[in-house]
Regions:
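A short helix/loop element that forms part of the nucleotide-sugar donor recognition site in Leloir-type
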Residues: 194-208
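Conserved acidic donor-binding segment of nucleotide-sugar-dependent glycosyltransferases
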Residues: 331-344, 350-354
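Nucleotide-activated donor-binding/catalytic signature segment of Leloir-type glycosyltransferases, i.e.
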Residues: 247, 255-281
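Carbohydrate-associated surface elements
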Residues: 168, 187
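Nucleotide-sugar-dependent
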Residues: 13-17, 225, 278-282, 290-311, ...
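Membrane-proximal helix-turn-helix segments that form the acceptor-binding/catalytic region
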Residues: 22, 91-95, 114, 118-122, ...
Length: 387
C-alpha cells in the first residue's frame, strides 16, 4: 500500500510520536510511506526561506525502516509563512498524488491537512484525519486559533474516517462534527521499555544514591508543566533523599535553572537537557515515580494522553499526575496512576504511595498496548478503506 502523510511539525527533529512508530512499522511490513512535513521551529533558523528538501530512507526508531520525508519550500518571514505554506504544500500534495499515486492519505496537522483532505476528496482517495492532540490550541498566534478550529471542522467533513488516540479526544472531535470515528490508542514497545533495564550507570552519573527516591519528568518544558512549583516546594526542605530528574528543554528551562541556583537545589533538581529517544528507557529506569504535574486548567492538556505515560507504566513506574480529564478518562482509578489537585501536591503524594504495588498495576494495564497490536489494528483500518 502507498501511504502519503501530511503534518505540520518537523518529522526529523521532533521526538517520536504516534505517527513515527506506526509509519516505520508499516514500512517494515512492505508498505511505502512518504511524509510531507513542516519546520515548525523555522524562526530559530537563519535565512528568509527554505528550499524544498527530500530525505530518502529516513528512520527514527527502526534502522530497517524506510520513510521518505519531503519538506516543501517555505518563506521564513512572519505573517508570510502561512500563505507560503498554502501555496507550496498544496503544490506538493498535488505532485505526490500525480507521481506517487497514494492509496490513502493521512493528516496529522491543520493547514496542509485541510489542503490534502480537499484534494483527496476531489481525487476520490480515502483520507484519514488522525488526532493525537488539539492542534488549534497549540497555534502560537492566538488570533489564528479560531481559524485553525474552522479548518479542523472543514477537514473532518472531507475525511473518510477520523481516528483519535484516546476516548476523551474522540469526544472532542465528535463535538466538531466527526461521525465516522475510531480510537486507536498509543502503543508501547514492551521490549524497549523493559522494567528489568539496569539503571546504576545513570544514577551514578547524576549523583543519585540507592536510598534516594527519584521523581522523573520528560518532555517539552512548558511554563504550565508544573515543574517550577515542584522545584520551589523541594526548596522548602522536604526529605533530603527526594530528587527531581528532568529530561527535556523548552520555555521553562532557564527559569528552572534560576530556581535551582537561587535555592541551592543542584543536588536535588537535575536538568539533563535533551536526550535521544534511545536513551529514555535507561533514564526512566533510574527513576522511582514518574510525574505529569501540568496545570489542571491548561486548555491544551484537557483532552490528551501523552504516549510517555504508557512508556512509564510499561516500565512498572507509578505515575503521579494532576487531575487532567483525558488521563482520568483513559486510566481511571487503581491502575498505577495517582491523582493530585495541583503541581506542588506531587511531593506529598510521593510519600504516600506504594511504589512497587502501583508500578505492577501500571504495567498490567498497558500490556495490551504493544506496538505490534496497535499496528495490526491500524493496518487493518487502512485495508478496510480499500474495499
Amino acid at each position: 500500500m502507498k501511504i502519503l502523510v501530511v503534518q505540520e511539525s518537523d518529522w526529523i527533529k521532533r521526538n517520536p510520536h504516534q505517527q513515527h512508530h506506526l509509519m516505520e512499522r508499516l514500512t517494515l511490513r512492505g508498505h511505502q510511506v512518504k511524509v510531507i512535513d513542516y519546520p515548525i521551529d523555522w524562526k530559530e533558523e537563519k535565512g528568509r526561506y527554505n528550499r524544498r528538501n527530500v530525505v530518502d530512507g529516513y528512520y527514527k526508531i527502526h534502522p530497517e525502516s524506510r520513510v521518505q520525508v519531503i519538506s516543501p519550500t517555505i518563506l521564513k518571514i512572519p505573517y508570510f509563512s502561512y500563505p507560503s505554506m498554502l501555496f507550496y504544500h498544496r503544490r506538493e500534495v498535488k505532485r505526490q498524488i500525480k507521481e506517487f499515486e497514494p492509496d490513502v492519505i493521512i493528516g496529522f496537522g491543520i493547514i496542509n491537512t485541510y489542503l490534502a483532505s480537499r484534494t483527496a476528496k476531489k481525487e476520490k482517495i480515502p483520507f484519514i484525519y488522525y488526532w493525537i492532540d488539539v492542534l488549534h490550541m497549540l497555534i502560537p498566534e492566538n488570533g489564528f486559533q479560531a481559524l485553525g478550529e474552522y479548518l479542523e471542522r472543514a477537514t473532518i467533513k472531507n475525511s473518510t474516517q477520523v481516528i483519535a488516540i484516546n476516548y476523551k479526544l474522540e469526544d472532542f472531535v465528535k463535538a466538531l462534527g466527526a461521525k465516522n470515528t475510531k480510537v486507536i490508542g498509543a502503543g508501547i514497545d514492551l521490549g524497549k521499555f523493559d522494567p528489568n533495564i539496569k539503571s546504576s550507570n545513570i544514577r551514578q552519573e547524576y549523583g543519585i544514591n540507592n536510598e534516594d527516591t527519584v521523581l522523573f519528568f520528560m518532555g517539552h518544558l512548558y511554563n504550565f508543566a508544573g515543574l517550577k512549583e515542584i522545584a520551589l516546594e523541594l526548596a522548602k526542605g522536604h526529605n533530603p533523599n527526594l530528587k527531581l530528574l528532568i529530561v527535556g528543554d523548552g520555555d521553562a528551562y532557564q527559569e528552572l535553572q534560576d530556581i535551582i541556583k537561587e535555592n541551592n537545589l543542584s543536588s536535588k533538581v537535575i536538568l539533563t537537557g535533551l536526550k535521544s529517544y534511545n536513551e529514555i528507557p535507561e533514564l526512566v529506569a533510574a527513576s522511582d515515580i514518574c510525574i505529569l504535574p501540568a496545570y489542571p486548567d491548561e486548555k491544551i492538556m484537557q483532552d490528551i494522553v501523552p504516549i510517555k505515560i504508557y512508556e512509564y507504566m510499561a516500565m512498572c513506574k507509578p505515575v503521579i499526575t494532576t487531575k487532567l480529564p483525558g488521563i482520568m478518562m483513559e486510566f481511571g482509578d487503581d491502575n498505577g496512576i495517582c491523582y493530585v489537585d495541583k503541581p506542588s501536591d506531587v511531593i506529598f503524594k510521593s510519600y504516600e504511595i506504594d511504589i512497587i504495588a502501583e508500578g505492577r498495576k501500571a504495567r498490567k494495564f498497558v500490556e495490551k498496548n504493544d506496538w505490534s497490536k496497535i499496528t495490526n489494528e491500524f493496518e487493518k483500518t487502512l485495508q478496510d478503506l480499500q474495499k
